[in-house]
A protein has these predicted regions:
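Beta1/beta-strand and adjacent pyrophosphate-binding region of the FAD-binding site
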Residues: 4-18
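An anion/pyrophosphate-binding glycine-rich loop and adjacent beta-alpha core
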Residues: 39-41, 84, 184-321, 418-491, ...
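Short hydrophobic core segments
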Residues: 13, 145-156
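A glycine-rich dinucleotide-binding beta-alpha-beta segment and adjacent secondary-structure elements
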Residues: 307-373, 401-414, 533-587, 592
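Internal hydrophobic alpha-helix adjacent to the cofactor/substrate pocket in enzyme cavities
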Residues: 379-400
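Conserved N-terminal/central alpha/beta ligand/cofactor-binding core
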Residues: 3-7, 24-132, 142, 154-174, ...
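Extended, charge-enriched "interface" segments that sit outside catalytic cores
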Residues: 431, 437, 448-453, 457-609, ...
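Glycine-rich phosphate/pyrophosphate-binding beta-alpha loops
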Residues: 369-377, 433-435
Length: 621
């Protein structure tokens, strides 16, 4: 028999990376919050890669931290090795990536939820969700009913989860945890547009069964850089990673057994991630490629499990072992956990607003893989947005909408709700038109004032941020006014760096603008240089060197925001506008864009359609 068990302002279904950020944000904004999880030992679980960050993902983590989220701080607490990716490219694509202790990460996050004021962590499977006059009723498998003003669905890969390993298939969530078997039917009954996606994970092998003799060692950067602006130091890197390569023999085993892959045998219905394909998918798609790289990464300090990055598979366990044994270093490896594919239910994100609230279901929000994305960082970013907006809805305040020009989080959300996701969506720097101004080094500059305004950034942290901004301003002023004389020592340094000598005094800022020079190379002649946070030097140098490009991009942002400010009605039938093509009418009615800017990014809406909309707006002011 059902029984009434309590009520909350905000309820979060799922305690993965999205659910954690949503719950913490809502509770910190003063809302009575609950987060429900099938298994409390799986809070903040990292069922795939034992790492946080990476290309574009590192940007997201820095932005989450700048807004007042938790992922960056916890990643720093659990870090094993840190590396800055893409150092050989421009600063826009520099991305931090950290190996983490995955079990410690889960433990630390669970404890943070337990200690958070206004927040209750509950082990309970939500099996039913029903709309009420002022919110939603959630029913657990134990028949407890909770009344909630707002709900955030963050079910990850648990919703209708099914594992595939060769011919073997069974209902399960990741890491052998029970799936959410009943909630999907309730969501469909409610009217949410669900579909099936698929992802996968590589095997974990025993550290002691690996031969490291001929493997390439991949060390971390020294000193390692933290994600969080509040982390002062990480200490030293604690582990090494290793690189190996597949070969022709590996390829042959895959080709001989491809019929045993559930993906190629037609057993998996869900659409998989384009940018994180299974190893057998790589072999089939790139048959001419003689070898593929893989990374061997530790899962923690107190475990012997090693993760084989780049080797996701759904082939039978014995086939996995056979092809692993063809790889240098893995000739005698022992599988501790086999690779598997997992299929799960998720929603069409175009059913949501930019607040991540469902258009047709007020007070119901979605976040993470439930929204069709992939990755821990993408999930955490959406969880933060959904949790903030669920709380702001309860508090009767204006919602948080991040635009594409202000953050990668805004780009991620806009892509999902405007363009949708026909496959698991992965964040990449190439998805942003404004990546030169959306660098990870200036995430605090872009988002910390907003985090403070919302209420997630403390006054103490905000004052530190303002002080940093003042120091940066003073340093730029110093560089503009400091004159370097043409001495023998100065010209020797310039010649050694491959740039022309100076014959008259030159402002320091003009030397830094030269492509061959940077802050470090000018240290010996810059005698008045103050001791500042390296992050300040980094920001100053980038802004000086790329001033022209940044200025050009800021003008593009100005134009874009003019279109974003041309608001469209949210309850309008576009079939009534003459001149719009049929496809545009259908897409506009489905997406219900909030602005001309958003309408222009909808696939199937042409520039001619936008012109029609602009004329219609002018006529109907």
């Amino acid at each position: 028999m059902k029984y009434f068990a309590g009520e909350y302002d905000v309820a979060v279904i799922g305690a993965g990376h999205a659910g954690i950020e949503a719950a913490l944000a809502a509770a910190r904004l003063g809302c009575k919050t609950a987060v429900f999880t099938i298994n409390m030992d799986a809070v903040g679980n990292c069922p795939c890669n034992p790492s946080i960050g990476g290309t574009a993902k590192g940007h997201l983590v820095r932005e989450i931290d700048a807004l007042g989220g938790e992922m960056g701080k916890t990643a720093d607490e659990c870090f094993l090795q840190s590396r800055m990716l893409n150092r050989g490219k421009g600063p826009a694509v520099h991305s931090l990536r950290a190996q983490i202790d995955r079990r410690k990460y889960s433990t630390v996050m669970k404890h943070k939820l337990e200690l958070q004021k206004n927040l209750e962590l509950r082990q309970a499977e939500i099996v039913e969700i029903e709309k009420t006059e002022d919110g939603y009723d959630l029913t657990t498998r134990m028949l407890a009913v909770f009344h909630c003003k707002t709900v955030v669905i963050a079910t990850g890969t648990y919703l209708g989860g099914r594992i595939f390993v060769g011919e073997v298939s069974y209902e399960s969530g990741p890491d052998g945890i029970f799936p959410a078997s009943f909630l999907g039917a309730s969501l469909k009954k409610l009217g949410l547009p669900l579909r099936r996606f698929k992802t996968g994970t590589p095997a974990r092998v025993s550290r002691n069964s690996i031969d490291y003799t001929d493997l390439e060692v991949q060390k971390g950067d020294e000193p390692p850089q933290p994600f969080s602006y509040e982390t002062e130091s990480l200490g030293e890197n604690k582990v090494d990673c290793y690189i190996s390569w597949t070969n022709d023999e590996t390829k042959q085993i895959i080709l001989e057994n491809i019929h045993r892959s559930p993906l190629y045998a037609g057993k998996i219905e869900g659409i998989g991630p384009r940018y994180c394909p299974s190893f057998e998918d790589k072999i089939m798609r790139f048959k001419d490629k003689p070898r593929h790289q893989l990374f061997i990464e530790p899962c923690g300090l107190d475990t012997e499990e090693m993760y084989l990055q780049g080797m996701s598979s759904s082939l039978p366990e014995e086939v996995q072992l056979k092809f692993y044994h063809t790889i240098k270093g893995l000739e005698n490896c022992v599988i501790m956990r086999p690779a598997y594919a997992i299929e799960y239910d998720c929603v069409d994100p175009t059913a949501m607003l930019a607040t991540l609230e469902f258009k047709d279901f007020p007070n119901l929000f979605g976040a993470g893989q439930f929204n069709g994305s992939s990755g821990y960082e993408e999930a955490a970013a959406q969880g933060l947005v959904a949790g903030i907006n669920a709380a702001l809805k309860v508090l009767g305040k204006s919602p948080l909408i991040l635009d594409r020009a202000g953050s990668y989080i805004g780009t991620l959300v806009d892509d999902l709700v405007t363009k949708g996701a026909n496959e698991p969506y992965r964040m990449m720097t190439s998805r942003s038109e404004y990546r030169l101004i959306l660098r990870q080094d200036n995430a605090d500059e872009r988002l910390t004032p907003l985090g403070h305004e919302i209420g997630l950034i403390s006054e103490e942290r905000y004052q530190k941020f303002l002080n940093k901004q003042e120091l940066k301003k003073q340093e730029i002023k110093r560089l503009k006014t400091t004159v370097i004389s043409p001495t023998e020592e100065v010209n020797k340094i310039l010649t050694e760096r491959g740039t022309s000598e100076i014959t008259t005094g030159v402002h320091l800022i003009d030397l830094i603008k030269r492509p061959q020079l940077d802050y470090k190379s000018l240290e010996s002649i810059d005698t008045g240089r103050p001791k500042l946070d390296p992050n300040i030097f980094e920001q100053v140098e980038v802004e000086i060197k790329y001033e022209g490009y940044i200025s050009k991009q800021l003008k593009q942002v100005e134009q874009m925001r003019k279109l974003e400010n041309r608001r469209l009605p949210d309850d309008f039938d576009y079939r009534t506008i003459k001149g719009l093509r049929l496809e545009a009418q259908e897409k506009l009615n489905k997406i219900k864009p909030l602005s001309i800017g958003q309408a222009s990014r909808i696939s199937g809406v042409s520039p001619a359609d936008i012109s029609v909309l602009l004329i219609w707006l002018a006529q109907n002011k």
